[in-house]
Amino acid sequence: MAKSKFERNKPHVNVGTIGHVDHGKTTLTAALTRVCAEVFGGTAVAFDGIDNAPEERERGITISTSHVEYDSPTRHYAHVDCPGHADYVKNMITGAAQMDGAILVCGATDGPMPQTREHILLSRQVGVPYIVVFLNKSDLLADDCGGADSEEYAEMLELVEMELRDLLSEYDFPGDDTPIIPGSALMALKGEDDNEMGTTAVRKLVETLDTYIPDPERAIDGAFLMPIEDVFSIQGRGTVVTGRVERGIIKIQEEVEIVGIVDTTKTTCTGVEMFRKLLDEGRAGENCGILLRGTKREDVQRGQVLAKPGSITPHTQFEAEVYVLGKDEGGRHTPFFKGYRPQFYFRTTDVTGACSLPEGVEMVMPGDNIQMTVELIHPIAMDEGLRFAIREGGRTVGAGVVAKILK
């Protein structure tokens, strides 16, 4: 059989399931593949195929993640599901699986639980822009209340919904406007649909993903940004900086800023080359060399970025959500305390920074995740959502994401 060609005619959207342990994230993931395969074509993936998540290494951290895909009439979804809570923490902080939107799975019989809250907080910290709620096990709640058309069931459902909306609002998500879909993932997985809680509910969830999560901005549509990896001077032509374009497009004769470490300067791109060929432009994802007019070799260094003027600014102080590697992951063997000064590796370079811990936290153990405030000794070009590694002498001991810029 010929290998099927990957159709690029639909927008590609990254989603994932989040929520408390045993509320049904993996069952829902399997149900989504089954329902979409049946209704819109594609391949169903069994529960076991998702639950045995392969281990991956991301920035030196071992994470177990399952990746599945499914289609709606208008989109192609790539979906991540993690077996354990620690895997979610690592996944979201390292950005190993960046989500354009998350499906928060909450058991209707339990209501919001500690990890429900923690995953909403993590989503806020790492910049997951949209959350849709699937209120799972609604069939069990209906059984407990004397049926899906009983008054008690309607009241209980409303209570859980209110709790969830309050929780979402607490972390600056639009709780009142968040879609909440009651249903049963297990029913949908088995192909059942009593009281429209199975297949119908999961179809409704897919329709909600289609309408509530907007098409993500593609890297190429962003404001031009290229982290500088190397600097050369070419006799008679000037200074060339090389790197991989992170987002946007750079054209010849466009003005750019050199941002980070020292004061921001302006210059003009007078040439773009790739594999020794001269081009009119450099695009997101491409490794290229950019010739800069009137810029001296010593005015530019690795760790700075080349960017569209005004699109990014340098900062030294920020709040971060950090995961500290466990001893078995090659991390530290001992805790660290406030005033800890490791290197923070942003894009292409290490910068020393001092850590302040939240009130009441004396020390941080290997394997913890923590919110901390960091003050760098040099400014770095950053946006909220930028990922970094924490290193000691070139060895990764943690991973983090900029949650809020302070200065």
Curated annotation (Swiss-Prot):
Keyword flag GTP-binding: yes
Which keywords has UniProt assigned to this entry? Cytoplasm, Elongation factor, GTP-binding, Hydrolase, Magnesium, Metal-binding, Nucleotide-binding, Protein biosynthesis
Give me the ranges of the annotated region G3.
Answer: 81-84
**Which residue intervals make up region (G1)?**
19-26
Annotated region (G4), positions in chain: 136-139
Q: Where is this region: G5?
A: 184-186
Q: Return any one Pfam family short name.
A: GTP_EFTU_D3
Which sites bind Mg(2+)? T26
The cellular location(s) given in this protein's UniProt record come to: Cytoplasm
- Give the record's GO CC terms: cytosol
Q: What does the record give as EC number? A: 3.6.5.3
Matching Gene3D superfamilies: P-loop containing nucleotide triphosphate hydrolases, Translation factors
What are the protein's GO molecular function terms? GTP binding; GTPase activity; guanosine tetraphosphate binding; translation elongation factor activity
User: Where does the protein principally reside?
Assistant: cytoplasm
Which positions are annotated as binding GTP?
Answer: 19-26, 81-85, 136-139
Query: Which residues are in coiled coils?
Result: none
What region holds the tr-type G domain?
Answer: 10-217
Give the span(s) annotated as G2.
60-64
Q: What does this protein do?
A: GTP hydrolase that promotes the GTP-dependent binding of aminoacyl-tRNA to the A-site of ribosomes during protein biosynthesis.
Quaternary organization: Monomer.
Similarity comment: Belongs to the TRAFAC class translation factor GTPase superfamily. Classic translation factor GTPase family. EF-Tu/EF-1A subfamily.
Protein's name according to its UniProt entry: Elongation factor Tu
